[in-house]
């Protein structure tokens, strides 16, 4: 794929055109069709206006956050770069437009990019243990066997852990430095979160002969309606705020404010975000960065609701603190900070305390079981 323009679609609706500038930033303009009956695909950065939008932030290497959300993260990017290298293409020479063209219509969320750079064929999921071994081979810089197969199944995925995707499910494999029961741990965390009143997607353990099972989560950016798969437009907090998720630059105050604004002050949505904050603190999920919170657009109501919770597991960070601070405290937040965030968001103080105490109690066995986990 060579060219300096790319068209953006949502289903068969023409959203707009992206074009690369001389300094390798990617400008965007809505189509006339979208200006007549569309919505702001990024609520703060890209209002529905007849103008050319040029990103000023370098958080996403010249892209607006909404489009950067379509790109794969660490694991998917590794697969893309390995696949390009196998074809004699230097990854450093690739533009952001070309990387989006590789994503085509296979990315997370609802946006699709045309013309797509079709460089792989459809692949069927085979033996999961064999796929896991191939993933580990790639991480260890070894011969991985059928690279095209792995790319097709995981080249558009987010997150750092090896994974494969189908139209309805994401299946995760342990990374090389993880214990083999990482799947059972994440399943336990998601089950506990549901018990804590947090909305989570359907999950299950896929059978394995070499570990206790591979964690599988049902995709919430896809919805089956009358046998048809509907793609749902969603954005991460990083994309909405145009911030680099790899830096700890966010507080739960911000997430609560975002939820109030995006959901049009929906009290249930606000309580969901509060519950997730309490769970992350009490269950020691410190990898709570800005790409681990997403909102899904409701076109009928013209508002955004928090997506089901995801990536809930025992985790730490290299700096030993939460990626998202709690009332300014990232190292050891507790009840005081949680209640302060709830109060600032306008929640009932008594209700906040009841929720926090309930989640603390429900996470005791879970947190103790996995204390000291090396992630």
Annotate each language-model stretch with its function.
Residues 1-290, 294-375:
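Phosphate/dinucleotide-binding and metal-coordinating scaffold of catalytic cores
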């Amino acid at each position: 794929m060579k060219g300096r323009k790319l068209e953006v679609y949502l289903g068969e609706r023409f959203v707009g055109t992206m074009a690369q500038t001389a300094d390798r930033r990617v400008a965007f303009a809505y189509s006339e069709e979208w200006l007549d009956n569309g919505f702001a695909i990024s609520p703060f950065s890209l209002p529905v206006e007849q103008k050319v939008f040029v990103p000023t932030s370098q958080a996403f290497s010249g892209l607006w956050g909404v489009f950067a959300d379509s790109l794969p993260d660490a694991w998917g990017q590794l697969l893309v770069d390995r696949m390009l290298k196998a074809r004699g293409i230097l990854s450093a020479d690739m533009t952001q437009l070309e990387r989006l063209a590789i994503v085509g219509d296979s990315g997370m969320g609802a946006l699709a990019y045309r013309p797509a750079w079709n460089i792989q064929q459809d692949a069927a999921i085979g033996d999961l243990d064999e796929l896991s071994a191939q993933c580990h081979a790639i991480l260890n810089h070894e011969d991985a066997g059928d690279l095209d197969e792995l790319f097709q199944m995981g080249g558009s995925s987010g997150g750092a852990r090896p994974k494969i995707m189908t139209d309805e499910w994401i299946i995760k494999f342990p990374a090389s430095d993880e214990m083999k029961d990482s799947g059972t741990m994440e399943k336990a965390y998601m089950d506990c979160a549901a018990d804590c009143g947090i909305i989570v997607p359907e999950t299950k353990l896929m059978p394995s002969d070499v570990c206790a099972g591979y964690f599988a989560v049902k995709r919430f950016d896809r919805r089956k309606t009358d046998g048809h798969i509907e793609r749902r437009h969603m954005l991460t907090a990083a994309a909405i705020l145009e911030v680099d998720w790899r830096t700890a630059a966010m507080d739960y105050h911000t997430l609560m404010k975002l939820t109030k604004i995006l959901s049009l002050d929906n009290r249930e949505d606000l309580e969901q975000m509060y519950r997730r904050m309490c769970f992350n603190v009490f269950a020691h999920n410190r990898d709570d960065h800005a790409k681990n919170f997403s909102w899904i657009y409701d076109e009928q109501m013209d508002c955004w609701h928090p997506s089901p919770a995801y990536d809930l597991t025992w985790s730490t960070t290299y700096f030993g603190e939460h990626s998202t601070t709690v009332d300014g405290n990232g190292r050891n937040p507790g009840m005081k900070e949680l209640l302060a965030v709830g109060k600032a968001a306008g929640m009932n103080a008594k209700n906040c305390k009841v929720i926090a105490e309930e989640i603390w109690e429900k996470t005791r066995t879970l947190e103790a079981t996995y204390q000291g986990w090396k992630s």
